[in-house]
Amino acid sequence: MDHKAYMYVLECRDGSYYIGYTTDMRRRLAIHNSGKGAKYTRARLPVKLIYAQGFASKEEAMSAEALFKRKKRPQKEEFLSENQDRNLLSYFEESWGVL
């Protein structure tokens, strides 16, 4: 895989979503779950990675993040179910073991 950055969706303990971007998915997920990540996720631990999409540049990942954040919850859920072919979750699960 030749991705330089990722847009990702976390599901928080309370069922809410957190959307972000990163250049190192494994490190970013560990930071979130250690309680040192975003203020939003610190109050809603643990978080679970449910979607990750790779991009050729950080700017593309940031644009995808911004677009996704503007959607209402039903639109986000529709996107997640319709774009499983782009979801890299199974790749990360195979590479890292259980997430």
From Swiss-Prot:
Alphabetized Pfam families for the sequence: GIY-YIG
Gene3D superfamilies, sorted: GIY-YIG endonuclease (3.40.1440.10)
Domain GIY-YIG: 3-78
Transmembrane segments: none
Superkingdom to which the source organism belongs: Bacteria
Family, similarity comment: Belongs to the UPF0213 family.
Protein name (record): UPF0213 protein SPD_1364
Organism listed in the record: Streptococcus pneumoniae serotype 2 (strain D39 / NCTC 7466)
Lineage of the species this protein comes from: Bacteria, Bacillati, Bacillota, Bacilli, Lactobacillales
